[in-house]
Amino acid sequence: IFQEPMSSLNPLHTIEKQINEMLITHSKISYADATKKTKELLINVGLESISKRIKSYSYELSGGQRQRVMIAMGIANDPDLLIADEPTTALDVTVQLQILKLIKNLQKKLNMAILFISHDLTVVKHLADHICIMKDGIIVENNTKENIFFNPQHEYTKKLVNFQNKKKNSKTLGSKKILEVNKLKVWYPIKKGILRRIVGHVKAVDSINLTLFKNQ
């Protein structure tokens, strides 16, 4: 799974064709059977409106939806090891959490190992059981999550953990409200036909309430 799914997916082919190609190449199954398996994969990664999304192109999907497709491609042939290279960096914070939960759930469900590459210690702490710390391309510490965060041995690891703790505790949340948003909606029209009539909407944001305090 790559950092930027938009550049990893082919904009000239539908999601169905791209996942089917992997299944047919490696499993030697028919196109109809591949499509059936593709639908199952997309359900497993939490993509909604499968019959519609499977016929979509990558540019018609949101960042989170594209990353779900990439995860579906990653698990398509039942790997023992899934490599995820900064898979949430290009996503907003809310979608990041959803994708992380999805990856963790799939790891347990499919009983596979995950090599998760990240520079974000918060993400690593949420996901990993065992951690390798690298500096200048060399592994300087290899230990359990508990030891890395609560008993680091290498000086570089200590600096990373201390910096993370300072950043987390650097500012106290204030009581002053600096932004409030109520029932925010961002809908994109779906146009079809020669006259490009609006036949529906993609609800990117639907009735979101947000309050932001000083230092938050």
Model-derived features: where do they sit?
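A short, surface-exposed alpha-helical micro-motif characterized by mixed small hydrophobic
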Residues: 124-126
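Conserved ABC ATPase "signature" region
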Residues: 33-52
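Short, glycine/charged-rich "phosphate-handling" switch motifs in NTP-dependent
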Residues: 130, 142
